[in-house]
A protein has these predicted regions:
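Bacterial N-terminal signal peptides that target proteins for export
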Residues: 1-9
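Acidic, glycine/polar-enriched metal-coordinating patches/loops
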Residues: 14
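Outer-membrane beta-barrel porins/channels
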Residues: 24-39, 86-92, 99-428
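Transmembrane beta-strand segments of Gram-negative outer membrane beta-barrel proteins
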Residues: 26-42, 61-79
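Surface-exposed strand-loop-strand hairpins of Gram-negative outer-membrane beta-barrel proteins
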Residues: 40-48, 77-98
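Outer-membrane beta-barrel pore proteins
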Residues: 43-47, 53-66, 107-113
Length: 428
């Protein structure tokens, strides 16, 4: 009798994001609307508003007034699936990422000429996917998934002088996951179902330095630490109709998985060309090579509770990932049209961490190019309203998956997305 292989979607909970979401690897970029307008070039050196709490906490030293910055970024993703084949029937509609909204909020208060204090609430990771139930590659992909990671970051900065400042903030990160995937075995012609829920709180930090190298050149370096999670929750298994209960039957188990989100470093430069023009450039390194594999541990599995096949099929589930480190590069510019208006644009190039051997419908990502435009309007000295638009286009990539049940799926994926953002900064 063939061994039942249960390919759960808890790996998505660990990876924590859909690659259609303007991601560097799987990390969301939407933490600043003003930064979105320049393609996040100069993320560590711009310090234009309170969102510098995330971009570079040392940048708080440049903000001379108490202020709050908030915003909302929305993402409308599209996926085309072509040349699909497999030994199971099904559909390949694509467009599995629903319309998504990502909020953010920051606060900065200068204490004196040297010290500043700030707070940030933002989403560093996220997921929202929804394949159709009849998806042909359902044994290698989540049917539905929602991951929420919310970070709270209290922050302080210190200016040694008018040239050099540093900043530091611990991060408190809460992740919750709810995922659903298909379970198809030779024991039944009908699909079963696996639903996984879990949550955890992880801790890290964000540290940065900002240097005014010349009167017109500013350099920033920011380091975001790794964060360790231990997702704990439960797995619910519902075999397809007709599956012999003595072999595999519906049950609920305690589940856990250890995961470490990667550290990243961003180096940015802001260059004042004249009174109107600014040039931004940046590079971000992310240590995605931490993600070698994903191992899910399900506890309390016995043959009497789950069927004869349950202990060998469900107790430990391991999926190879073998990701590699990535670099993202960005260049952007802004033009101060007048006292009220600033115009922005940027271009970004972002590597994918996946490889051709292990890539699956769960994370069918390729290298991407992102074009961005934006604007800021300041009707008064106290208020600035920012808007931004980004268009993302990925290279075509192929997935080619098979498992020990003899099931297979291959297809060509092409992803794109439109991102819109609106935010405001109020100074008081």
């Amino acid at each position: 009798m063939k061994k039942v292989i249960l390919k759960t979607s808890l790996s998505l909970a660990v990876a924590m994001a859909s690659t259609q979401l303007f991601a560097s690897g799987l990390a969301l970029n939407e933490q600043s609307i003003s930064g979105m307008g320049t393609g996040f070039a100069g993320r560590s050196s711009a310090a234009d508003d309170a969102s510098t709490v995330f971009g570079n906490p040392a940048g708080m030293s440049r903000l001379k007034r108490q202020q709050v910055t908030g915003g909302l970024a929305t993402i409308d993703a599209s996926t085309d699936i072509n040349d699909a084949s497999g030994n199971q029937s099904g559909t390949n509609k694509g467009d599995m990422v629903p319309f998504t909204a990502i909020p953010m909020a920051y606060y900065v208060k200068p204490i004196d000429d040297q010290w500043a204090f700030g707070l940030g609430v933002y989403a560093p990771f996220g997921l929202n996917t929804d394949y159709e139930n009849s998806f042909q590659g359902r044994n290698f992909s989540s049917k539905k998934g929602e991951i929420k990671v919310v970070t709270f970051q209290p922050t302080v900065s210190y200016a040694f002088n008018d040239k050099v400042s540093i900043g530091f903030g611990p991060t408190i990160n809460r992740m919750s996951a709810s995922l659903e995937s298909a379970l198809t075995t030779p024991l039944s012609p009908n699909d079963g179902n696996v639903q996984i829920k879990g949550d955890d709180i992880g801790y890290g930090y964000n540290i940065g330095v900002l240097v005014q190298a010349t009167d017109t050149t500013r350099v920033g370096l920011t380091y975001h630490s790794k964060v360790k999670y231990k997702l704990e929750g439960h797995t619910e298994v519902s075999p397809g109709a007709g599956t012999p209960g003595a072999l595999l039957r519906g049950a609920r188990y305690d589940a856990s998985v250890d995961f470490t989100s990667p550290e990243s470093a961003d180096l940015s430069v802001t260059q004042d060309l004249n009174d109107a023009w600014k040039l931004y450039a940046g590079a971000t390194w992310t240590r995605w090579s931490r993600l070698k594999d994903i191992t899910v541990q399900n506890e309390g599995i016995t043959a009497s509770a789950g069927g004869l096949l349950a202990p060998s099929a469900i107790s430990t589930i391991k999926e190879e990932q073998n990701w590699h480190d990535t670099w993202a590069y960005a260049i952007g510019t802004s033009y101060q049209l007048n006292k009220q208006w600033v115009l922005r644009t940027g271009l970004s190039f972002d590597q994918s961490p996946t490889n051709n051997t292990n890539r699956s419908p769960r994370i069918p990502t390729g290298d991407r190019t992102i074009f961005s435009i934006g604007a800021g309007w300041s009707p008064t000295d106290d208020l600035t309203i920012d808007v931004a638009y980004s268009y993302l286009k990925e290279e075509k990539v192929k997935v080619n998956n098979s498992n020990q049940l003899g099931q297979s799926y291959s297809a060509e994926y092409e992803n794109s997305a439109n991102g819109f953002g609106v935010g405001a900064t109020y100074r008081f």
